[in-house]
């Protein structure tokens, strides 16, 4: 399963690690923060520097063929917008961080 995660912070990186450990998932992690991207590159996944609200960044991350998109940044408004954009680019299940905390 291809999972695209926007946000390489504690929540996003933790989800990515858990999904990679299952060994059934390909994970792409996307973040605007250069330091977060560098830290995440230590794991066995594709890590991209980019904005989750940038159509081209999502396409580069593989959103058009992704099975799941997870917006896990600490900015709820951006998470919601990113889920909408991801859904527009490819019909799949969008999950935002708030859904994970309930």
Labelled PLM ranges:
Residues 1-102:
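Cytosolic regulatory regions of ion transport systems
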């Amino acid at each position: 399963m291809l999972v695209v995660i926007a946000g390489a912070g504690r929540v996003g990186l933790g989800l990515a690690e858990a999904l990679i450990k299952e060994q059934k998932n390909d994970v792409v992690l996307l973040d605007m923060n250069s330091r977060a991207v560098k830290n995440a590159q230590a794991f066995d996944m594709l890590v991209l520097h980019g904005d989750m609200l940038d159509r081209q960044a999502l396409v580069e991350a593989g959103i058009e063929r992704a099975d799941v998109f997870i917006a896990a940044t600490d900015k709820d408004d951006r998470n919601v917008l990113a889920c909408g954009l991801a859904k527009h680019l490819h019909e799949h299940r969008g999950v935002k961080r708030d859904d994970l905390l309930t």
